[in-house]
Amino acid sequence: YFYAIEYIVNRFLDKTKYERHNKYLQELYIPNPPTDIQQQIVTEIEQVVNAAALLTQQIKQKENEIENLLSSIQYGDDSLKTIAPFATKSIKYFEIESETYITTDNMLQNKLGIVPFEGEANISSITEYKKDDILISNIRPYLKKIWFADKDGGCSKDVLVLRSADTNKYLPKYIFYMLRRDVFFDYVMEGKKGIKMPRGNKEDILKYRIPIPSIDEQMRIVSQIEALESEITKARNLIENTASEKQTILDKYL
């Protein structure tokens, strides 16, 4: 009955109230189709669940391929202070489109980018960012919030903006991939300030070193990773559709 209960919860319960309380559950009607229909529901939904599990494994495999590629790079290194120092130009909030505003709140955990900002920010001064900049949340670095800017905009002061010092020598996307690694966030956490709300130490962050191959090699590496990223994105999109696929099956039989 798990899938039937899931169907009821998702379709009929008011999510604004705590309706999983016993008094509501006692009044719930749970469909009880014939056994053969129940078995068909289970079979079809398990196919969806198993497909999602396989996609999750594929994502992990592709992520490991990316990490193995990046960890195998053996070239002379340099510090972020030289490669991609902080961009710190302050601008006014009214100078940007509100949907381009980035805060720690609309940055997603585990390196998943951002979601659009909604509403109006109660703030005047923000930090300008440009397309191809790298934005990193400096609050609770262990949440691993990082984004490669695909547009111009502004961000809160709790978001660090790193910009390639010379795009002819340091490819922005290459820098981004080198910083989007667990090893970088582990490094930031080692030098953190504060306990309850830890922040990265900006001076230490600028000391972080990454290997710098030729610009042609950087482009080749980025191209390889982007191909893997494309496969990961496709798999994630399919996983996101899992809930609606399960609901379609339940709607068909219940």
Regions found by a protein language model. Give the residues of each.
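Short glycine-/small-residue-rich Rossmann-like dinucleotide-binding loops
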Residues: 140
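Short, Lys/Arg- and Gly-enriched loop/turn segments at beta-strand edges
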Residues: 143-149
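Non-catalytic DNA-recognition/assembly elements of restriction-modification systems
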Residues: 32-93, 107, 207, 211-222, ...
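A generic structural signal for residues embedded in beta-strands
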Residues: 136-137
